[in-house]
Amino acid sequence: MKRFYNVYQFVAPLVFFPIAYWLWWQRLDQKHDVTSLVMFVPVISYYFFVVIGVLKFRLWHMNTWPTIRGIRPHHGFVIATAAALFFYLCLRMVPVGETGILSILTAAFLGASVFGFWNWWYETYAVKSGFISIYTKKIAEGASAEEAVTDYAPVFFGSMGACHGAFVKVAENLLLPDHGAELYWLVAAGGGLTLILVPTGAYLLVHRIKHGESGLKSYSDVMKP
């Protein structure tokens, strides 16, 4: 299984990122500015998570090549590529012409469901195969990969999927019509911050309720190498 992850991490950004870009470009009226926003804001957000999680809090580590202090240089593109394809398929159920609040809520629900499940599956087998090492309270207590990942993945990735789905639909609704630069950058900044703050806040809150601690404590020092 680890071989799959080692290959997929290169195939995803090299092969599927251009495909995802083209699909979104077609949906978004062949507008490169809106397509670039939908594709690259998540890339930046996902880089933020891995840099802070690995370097600052030492919550996990990538056991692959190439890495820089446990971080894949291409990590943001790996995750954002899968996300872009998932959300493109999800939003096939929400036509471009639907621009009301219900369209955004539907995109958020679909994103939470799909992204939450598939990232739980991906992360579980990445941990089981040794591709990723996580240093959370559950894994330090001897929990299995399934138990440890299930402790955080549904909330973290589910809320991330909801934010991502809502972000791309808001961008579509507001930016496909004529718009100014101010609105464009407002959507970009708002989407990026939401993708970072909401999943982080949801994870910290649920972890505090379940375990009585913030969820930012690394157990790498008490675990066997």
What name fits each language-model region?
Residues 1-225:
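Aromatic-rich, lipid-facing transmembrane alpha helices and their immediate juxtamembrane interface loops
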